[in-house]
């Protein structure tokens, strides 16, 4: 039988606007997320919901789960978010408007989020932040100016185009710094990362455990060969990448 090819066009023909992907351990927290997204306009004709299932144990980690989810996504834009976020006063129309404004301002954007650190800040004595979020540190918090270009993003809410994906490193694993890694990979691809103004509530609490410090060291060791001397600002603190190729092991 003669093969029947599919002719692919250079355009996004998806009828869905969003694929909302979540890394899920706690079903109750995820149910709260689902209810809030539905309440704020992410209806079945506009969005699909996919869950990386860690309810029975960690079969996915931060650097791996995006890769598993992307091939299954059908939306024009893919959201990667924690299970413990909740929409509180911004919804579907607000996010679409924020994306459209970003598209017009900088077509080279590849990754966006709601909390990050401004790109290449001049002052390294304090950690630079750009965000609008409610979290364990306070309600309706604002730091810096959003939208703005950033060099790292918090993992609680990440966004990219399905047809312009950015993947995390294959040589790292864990649940910390994969947002920063994603932004640095976007730089390698010739793109940029942005923090946008899309207020939501993140109930999570960052834990600086042994794995946090291990990944911090691995990030510095990995990226110093390409960015020698750079001080990378993240919402959880600064990472001094160190020297050049002679320090890479």
From Swiss-Prot:
This is ATP synthase subunits region ORF 6. InterPro entries: Nucleotide-diphossugar_trans (IPR029044).
